[in-house]
């Protein structure tokens, strides 16, 4: 087995799927670690092409020889909730002004999508996490 490469940095970004370009915020974040920005952009765009339209969080591990690896996560729960509810943004005052409603089935669908990134052991637990996020955005969960 090849010797382990020394990690010099871990960068976490949220980028539109298939739309990474060297402009800020990507360029400066990668540039200060000496990563080839265009190489990352091409690899990220190829990996996320199927999910166009979503914001995809990515964790980039930078090694001392300036090479990198990256792991894409599932879209943020808030983004999935807004898309399912059909709203542009959550409520400014979530506990007094409600902006939309979600059914329990929609919450379960989002929970199953997010399951691998959530700190939950069961789908019910994941659904409770998603429902809590929705409530804090001023979106009512029915059922």
UniProtKB/Swiss-Prot annotation:
GO terms for molecular function: large ribosomal subunit rRNA binding; structural constituent of ribosome. GO terms for biological process: translation. InterPro entries: Ribosomal_uL11 (IPR000911), Ribosomal_uL11_bac-typ (IPR006519), Ribosomal_uL11_C (IPR020783), Ribosomal_uL11_C_sf (IPR036769), Ribosomal_uL11_CS (IPR020785), Ribosomal_uL11_N (IPR020784), Ribosomal_uL11_N_sf (IPR036796). Keywords: Methylation, Ribonucleoprotein, Ribosomal protein, RNA-binding, rRNA-binding. One or more lysine residues are methylated. Gene3D superfamilies: Ribosomal protein L11, C-terminal domain, Ribosomal protein L11/L12, N-terminal domain. SMART domains: RL11 (SM00649). One of its GO terms (cellular component) is cytosolic large ribosomal subunit. The keyword Nucleotide-binding does not apply. The keyword Ribosomal protein applies. Belongs to the universal ribosomal protein uL11 family. Forms part of the ribosomal stalk which helps the ribosome interact with GTP-bound translation factors. HAMAP family: Ribosomal_uL11. Part of the ribosomal stalk of the 50S ribosomal subunit. Interacts with L10 and the large rRNA to form the base of the stalk. L10 forms an elongated spine to which L12 dimers bind in a sequential fashion forming a multimeric L10(L12)X complex. This is Large ribosomal subunit protein uL11. It comes from Arthrobacter sp. (strain FB24).
